[in-house]
């Protein structure tokens, strides 16, 4: 018994002598660290290409059980240019997961046919830390008991997310901030940006100003009714339907009804009141539904009958009309539904992932919020706005974006004063698009790309961040202005040598030229750049300085080593003293040792056996990613001795472990592959687990979703 107590005491001293894992108490972000994914170390090479990752479901409001899921990627290569920049990426819907952005567009990974990650050479995390957020709550892996219904609430909730996020990553709070996203994020992002700018002007005590530098909206759904007027001209101009069609009269009639609604909106545009005819876009949006129906090629096979609404050069089955695209979506969905992956992503509440949530879309009526187009003029007075568009998209096409800009007043003028003043965008010696730019708003039309520009042209899309941050060259060729950007690796060398520091740090700005753009070039695809080879034989990961506080240093300082030696010396002396006492105790004459009656088994040994059995209850490990729960000194000792050997991320399924997945219904119709979710339009039925939820405004009408 006495010996057991001494052994426990010695082990306890060993535990106390070893410094606690750095960040276990002061760095709560450690429990969100992602250490593995299927295919990560098999397919992503060299090792330096593996990004530092954090993900999990971050609690915002415990009173209504609202948690936002985020997935953050940090460049593992030490890079001064990327270490002070943060990009928040949002997909649309409403109710479509930003995992589309992470795994199909701007993130470092794509998913292959084996449902494993492979590397994306065009990842935006090479420009700055990028965080993908599933929002509003109920989208993707986010969850809540109370769904939100309006755009103002989107902004409030996201500011709360940022507040909680910076508690996890306080070293990043002074970073430059960019927001980027696509489609219905054209509503989200302006509202969030506007809320941040207002917050910065009304800081409370101890608040830190958010350094918002710019927003980028790809194929954005910003002015719904106005943009819907572009559908019929688009189909005519691209030869997708002609005026001799038997249903032409019906199409023209609906177009005229939409035009009357838009005229009414224009007449009251400057009013602060929210008018029902402006926030209800059902009539105008139905034009596209009819066009897709009437333009079917009924002689084609069933899989190629309908025009793909996201890329008019592609075909799909009807009525999917693009909802089965991108084809890799059939790999993404089962990948995110794997228990192994949910384990790796640190989910604390298991949720069956779906690309788009019909429930979120139905609850999110946005009936009390003006369309985001109203916010652009004020935002542009403070930060640059980039509106980029894939030229092949129908649903949020370039003509629709230009049509609302033509009417918009910003910077004291209406629209672009000279639409012929187009700037050629050159990337990797190829003309990839053109730019219109005035008064802090830029429109960029990108050739040979769809609704999801980063999916088609990942390298080109990353160069958008070079445009918004001013990392480009400006030249003139044949009387036309050109903005020149470079592939990763070339940009710093070329710009560092040829552009003065003060020029390369400026965002794109207005410069005079009145020459028209030439005809669109032939289709070109930029070559993807390869990740740089490893320059060191060391197998240790390189961690960005912004995350250094989470990772133990490879070598301790001399003073730390000296302290360890003193501690170990003290422990050795104590151990030696205990040993001498024990030997003296055993060496005493047996005649003077009183032996109490007892069973054959030693009580002390029996306790040791019992403690060993209890070790199965402890999950603590010195390599555990999350902060350990409170423990007594004996429990710490036992945990230190035995420890858990799992090398995966924290995984704590809710409930008793028997909980079933939460299920949603697929959006839309006509999807032949059960693994493929609808990409955007329509939510016809409730999810299988449709439960009563609280909303802030009764039962809003069902709305189309734009991803």
From Swiss-Prot:
Residues in the signal sequence: 1-17
GO biological process, one term: apoptotic process
Transmembrane segments: 565-585
Parts of the chain on the Lumenal side: 18-564
One Pfam short name: Peptidase_S10
GO cellular component, one term: trans-Golgi network
Glycan attachment sites: 64, 121, 293, 378, 440, 448
Cytoplasmic side: 586-707
Compositionally skewed regions (Basic and acidic residues) per UniProt: 503-533, 695-707
Annotated function: Protease with a carboxypeptidase B-like function involved in the C-terminal processing of the lysine and arginine residues from protein precursors. Promotes cell fusion and is involved in the programmed cell death.
Protein name, entry field: Pheromone-processing carboxypeptidase KEX1
Organism from which the protein derives: Candida tropicalis (strain ATCC MYA-3404 / T1) (Yeast)
